[in-house]
Amino acid sequence: MNAPLKLAIVEMAVCAFVAVILSGCASRDLTPAPNGPRVDLMSQSQYLHLIENNTQTKKVYDGFALLLEYRISFLNTPISLGQVDMNTQLYQYSDSQYQNEKGTTQSNLVKQTEFFLSLYIPDGKYDDLAKKNTKWKIFLDVAGQRYEAKAVRIKAQLRDVQNLYPFHDRFSTAYKLIFPVSTSITENGVAKLTLTGPMTS
């Protein structure tokens, strides 16, 4: 039979993350931008350190049976801008492409908060977070307000996803969780991310 599953997935003092992240940003390497002038790009090792320190992993069991496994990353300002740097080096962006991507990212940071979710559910019929008729609900509580997520399934090639999220594997589904609240608000408070939905029990 089916029973509702409610998980308080992430309850984190986001401001504590920022202290670690900002220290990493202060020591960025100067890397030549391909097809353009030198710009201050984050190195791969610095980016991997940031994403590792802002990712939480958990397995949920019913007895000995695995119900789901997730890895979730808070895409705060340093990580989001770091992803632009990583893509610039990987895909050989010109300086104008780099500036356009950076501008788009900065605009999104003002409008919304994003998380990356790598989700594995053995019973695949429940892996439908992005469908209109899904039973799953995802909430972000921050600054005394609750926001509901829009879940978007990432359809990029596995290797492209792993370039930014090396912990993601081919057995899991990649999602972007988008909340209509500025990233700066989430960064400067304590946020709780809650996932509720159906699950076999």
Residue ranges and their predicted role:
Residues 2-14:
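Bacterial N-terminal signal peptides that target proteins for export
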Residues 26-201:
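Conserved functional micro-motifs across diverse proteins
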Residues 21-24:
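C-terminal motif of bacterial Sec signal peptides marking the signal peptidase cleavage site
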